[in-house]
Amino acid sequence: MSVYAGIFNTTLNPQELNMKSFAGTILRRVPNGSAPLLAMTSVVGSTTAKASTHGYFSKTMVFASAVVTAEAAADATVLTVENSDGLTKGMIFYNEATGENMRLELVNGLNLTVKRQTGRISAAIIAANTKLIVIGTAFEEGSQRPTARSIQPVYVPNFTQIFRNAWALTDTARASYAEAGYSNITESRRDCMDFHATEQETAIFFGQAFMGTYNGQPLHTTQGIVDAVRQYAPDNVNAMPNPTAVTYDDVVDATIDAFKWSVNVGDNTQRVMFCDTVGMRTMQDIGRFFGEVTVTQRETSYGMVFTEWKFFKGRLIIKEHPLFSAIGISPGFAVVVDVPAVKLAYMDGRNAKVENYGQGGGENKSGATDYSYGHGVDAQGGSLTSEWALELLNPQGCAVITGLQKAKERVYLTAPAP
């Protein structure tokens, strides 16, 4: 112990004696973007999964046609085709090459008996590999009921995935006083919730279906959007031909197939494009290089922010998903999503199910019914459990794009001074 002579100042107290001055809660720093970190989790609908194997049935509209395998003369009435599935008596064929219409009168295996020149255009030679398009049916008055047709449903399987995260601290830590506004228990719980939410958001995009075992028990994971597109709509996976000079036409080519099919649950002219930071900048630059900007003297701000990208098939709502950049995906990544066609199918009672362990020191509430359990440990904690399967009803309405690294800059032509 010592005696100080002079004016007392703040450096003379032990550090522990000075009260700290700071904000009442801990600052939480998360990745930023025009979409929130939990963009998909916060907007998709939910439904119920009744088993760990969860799937759905889909039907894709079929437009009938027939491909002629051998040349047929102008007066030929029997045509041999590659496939006759779904063809029935009464259908009208249209030959785009010659303009002739003909009526199908009999299907015998791969041999079709037709009535030529069913219309104004005269019959002509039908070349091999000609595609005959079905443009409807035509029946006589008082006709018999036609052959029924139906589209066979396809089962699209997936599995549920169990997400678990926990929080825990010793009861001494629980009882210890912290700085004003800070709670050891609250912060531990909050960390648990953040991990639980972000892991599910990541799985929505990047999960893959798997069924196996671990510790003698079933272990299953769900298929995310990216893998579903790769499996069911591989033509919708596109890499930019020149990642450092991406053009408007490149983006059209990469997204057009996502508008080819629609389902009866949403807007068939709208999709959402989630980009990383680099991809978002590229989309902005494409718009910026696309037109002319006029600035007047009265303007006090400049610059442009594009939230939609339009072309002849529809429009894309452009969002920067902070998760893509945060987890380190290769720069220039984007996923086009038909959002109304995405749902999370939760198992009953397993949507962020809460369990608390050892409240008050670990030995109390052994018979409690409020999800609190003693476990004989001088600590307390808890867990969150969610189990769901991703239900993507329209993978053909989504797309995966890589290489959106830099927009092709505009070339300005300058004329020499007169």
Swiss-Prot record:
Top-level taxon:
Viruses
Q: Which GO terms describe its cellular component?
A: viral capsid
Q: Which InterPro entries match?
A: SU10_MCP
The record lists the effect of I121 to A/T as: Escapes CBASS defense in P.aeruginosa strain Pa011
- UniProt main location, coarse: virion
Where are the disulfide bridges? none
Q: Where does this protein have coiled-coil stretches?
A: none
Q: Where in the cell is it found?
A: Virion
Q: Which UniProt keywords apply?
A: Capsid protein, Late protein, Virion
Pfam families, per the entry = SU10_MCP
Query: What is its biological role?
Result: The most highly expressed virion protein; probably the major capsid protein.
Q: How does it assemble?
A: Multimerizes.
Fill in the misc note.
Mutations in this protein confer resistance to host-encoded CBASS type II-A(GA) viral defense (in P.aeruginosa strain BWHPSA011 / Pa011); overexpression of this protein alone in the host does not activate CBASS. The above mutations are predicted to lie on protein-protein interfaces within or between monomers.
Q: What is this protein called?
A: Major capsid protein
- Species: Pseudomonas phage PaMx41
